[in-house]
Amino acid sequence: MLIKDTIFYRPDWRWHIFLKYLTNNLSKYNCLEKIIPSEYSYKDSTYGSKKSKKNVNLCTWGVTHKKRIQFARAVCINSPKYSVLNFLIIPNTIYNVPFFGVDFVSLPNIYLLVLDFQPSLKIQNQYNNQLLEKLIKLKNHCHSSLPLAEEMSVDVARFFSPGAIWSKLPKEERSDFLIANQLYTSFKEYLDLYLEILFESKEVNIDLQKELINGQNNYLNYRRDNDPARPMLSSLFGKEFTESLIKEVLFTT
């Protein structure tokens, strides 16, 4: 099933404009869709007690690029209580470029919003001052409208840049406006800047490539072991499917 034919492209799914922008822009860079095993590419299921069963839909979509992108994938979830867009670009390690990470989650009473160029090396070894200044300026503009959430723990913060957007919003009309306007604008600015940098980057030497491979593996292994979405996914799809999805699709190249 094509992602354009799913519920995730319809206006009633919370993150549809973000997903459309992702897919359209990656296609402009001649990215090729990657075949995802059918058990993960689209799934309809139910969750909850026998008396109050609820439907849930999951779609996993991905692309690659012959030189620049090892794997870029989106995981989309739609249900009465949860709506999720999780997106990650894993760049080719011949370029010294961070990950691009998005985690937009709608819970029963709150929105959790994360957007960042996530480092695979120490900040000073992967971001020049010009890039950091651009990111921090974009972040500060976004957070002039969206509240900044609490400080991340040291263990988690090492996988985020100084330009990370991190916010929590209550489920109310004002938040809908902020998501459709300020967050969407920031999302487009971040993705456009990221793809520009990725596709203009020069190849690095073998020693740095080895560091990048190790750095990417450290992040992916950490996420496989500590993915904060694991409890939610398990409640919606069961533990066995969740573990398989996390280990075989979400955090692998």
Swiss-Prot record:
Keywords: Oxidoreductase. It holds the Pfam family Fe_bilin_red. The keyword Electron transport does not apply. It is an enzyme of class 1 (oxidoreductase). Its EC number is 1.3.7.3. One of its GO terms (biological process) is phytochromobilin biosynthetic process. GO terms for molecular function: cobalt ion binding; phycoerythrobilin:ferredoxin oxidoreductase activity. It comes from the Bacteria. It catalyses: (3Z)-phycoerythrobilin + oxidized 2[4Fe-4S]-[ferredoxin] = 15,16-dihydrobiliverdin + reduced 2[4Fe-4S]-[ferredoxin] + 2 H(+). Belongs to the HY2 family. PANTHER family: PHYTOCHROMOBILIN:FERREDOXIN OXIDOREDUCTASE, CHLOROPLASTIC. NCBIfam families: PRK13248.1. This is Phycoerythrobilin:ferredoxin oxidoreductase.
